Design a protein with these regions (language model features):
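Phosphate-binding site recognition
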Residues: 1-433
């Protein structure tokens, strides 16, 4: 019997199933979304933890186009036994990925946005057949990249057209919603990007009468940017949330089954040491990118860390003070440290506040909470509760990355070398004490 292929880099759900790659069944994510019925859901998880593949799965499940063909993709999955299969193929779906918006100027970014929106409009060209001339002209001007005025409301406009055509409300999927904003900060056009995406997102998700559900993925929880201001129906699910914890990354039993299938179950101990250790909600999670690459290479090494460079994190380290490096030393020594994690932040404030760096380390997958439960403290003078978590490095892969990349890179700059050496010396003294 031919074995299924190892799915390295496969993010299209249809291809995953039809071309018989090994697929870890995450289809009950669909049922949980339908049970919870949040109008708009934001999932934040680290890079390469299955966000795009899950979004692709949602597209193929809900999409009203090709619904009979798409139904076959789910025949052998857990969701096929759910009563919520009656929701399959019922809705028009707009799927927009923003993870490749990497332009170095705002002018180039706008061109990339136009290209992305144009591609989506071309996908639905058939709905123009029943439009009046005014609507058809508006549609075609956006499709042909000639309409700048309606660009920031183009997703809302498309959902209105789809609702009118099908008579069913629309599901909007936005993958890597924060990628263009982070890239804008790194390249000096943050204000222009924020002004655009505030309207782009809020028009599609907040004031949209044609919306059934909106689902977004990203890495950061940048609630305070104003992008989601007034969006009372937004549910934010992070690595700290209890719900949906099992759907991004791999559970222990899923990894065991994979290693057994590929006949290397005896390697489970070293796999656990290198790639386990993430605590999402109350679940222990393995890094899926590292697991599939390990299955291919049969060698323990840093797979995820070596391809998940984070320019924003590096910029933050460039601006960081001595206390950050002292804590980095403690983390590499295997300590867990209690840190405050805010409910939301602005991307721009990350560069100006050393305390914010730990939030980005956590959400980006370089740190995880320890198994100890949340410690909740009341700050009565401010009149609100804050969350503090015991954070730690999750596994040997990330510890090797801290040692070889985050710390060693600063020996290339004179200023940071002094800070780092001082921090390491102080850390050693504390250990001796």
């Amino acid at each position: 019997m031919n074995k299924k292929a190892i799915p390295i880099g496969i993010e299209n759900f249809e291809r995953m199933i039809k071309e018989e790659y090994y697929y870890v069944d995450k289809s009950m994510l669909i049922e949980d979304i339908l049970v919870n019925r949040a109008a708009v859901t934001l999932f934040t998880r680290p890079r390469r933890f299955g966000k795009t593949l899950n979004m692709s799965m949602l597209k193929y499940f809900f999409d009203i186009e090709n619904k009979d063909k798409n139904r076959k993709l789910f025949e052998n999955l857990k969701i096929s036994g759910s009563k919520y299969m009656n929701e399959q193929g019922k809705y028009p779906v707009i799927f927009i990925s923003l993870k490749d918006l990497k332009a170095d100027t705002w002018e180039k970014c706008i061109l990339e946005i136009k290209k992305t929106v144009s591609k989506i409009y071309r996908e639905f060209q058939y709905i123009t057949e029943n439009m009046d001339e005014d609507d058809k002209n508006t549609y075609n001007s956006i499709k042909n990249r000639k309409n700048d005025i309606d660009l920031n409301t183009s997703i809302e406009l498309l959902s209105d057209f789809l609702y009118e055509y099908y008579g069913n409300k629309v599901i909007i999927l936005i993958d890597e919603y924060d990628s263009p904003i982070i890239n804008a900060l790194n390249n000096g056009y943050y204000n222009e990007a924020i002004n655009f995406f505030q309207v782009f997102y809020s028009s599609a998700l907040k004031t949209n009468d044609s919306l059934k559900y909106g689902i977004l993925t990203g890495i950061t929880r940048i609630i305070k940017e104003g992008i989601f201001s007034g969006l009372n129906n937004l549910y934010v699910n992070t690595v700290l949330s209890q719900d949906y914890a099992e759907y991004f990354g791999l559970l222990e039993n899923e990894v065991t089954e994979m290693l057994d299938y590929f006949e290397i179950k005896y390697k489970m101990k070293e796999v656990r040491n290198w790639y386990n250790g993430y605590c999402f909600g109350d679940k222990q999670i393995y890094n899926p990118w590292s697991i599939v690459n390990y299955l291919k290479e049969k060698e323990v090494k840093a797979y995820w860390a070596n391809v998940s460079g984070n320019i924003l994190l590096e910029n933050m380290l460039d601006h960081a003070g001595e206390s950050v490096y002292i804590d980095l030393k403690k983390f590499t020594d295997g300590e867990s440290i209690e840190k405050y994690i805010s409910d939301g932040t602005t991307i721009k404030s990350l560069l100006n506040n050393d305390d914010e760096i730990w939030q980005l380390f956590l959400y980006s997958g370089y740190l995880t909470k320890s198994e100890e439960q949340i410690k909740r403290k009341e700050f009565s003078e401010q009149g609100y509760f804050t969350n503090t978590y015991n954070l730690k490095i999750p596994n040997r892969e990330i510890r090797s990355y801290f040692g070889n990349i985050f710390i060693n890179r600063f020996f290339g700059t004179e200023v940071k070398t002094d800070i780092l050496i001082k921090a390491l010396e102080n850390g050693d003294k504390e250990c001796e004490g």
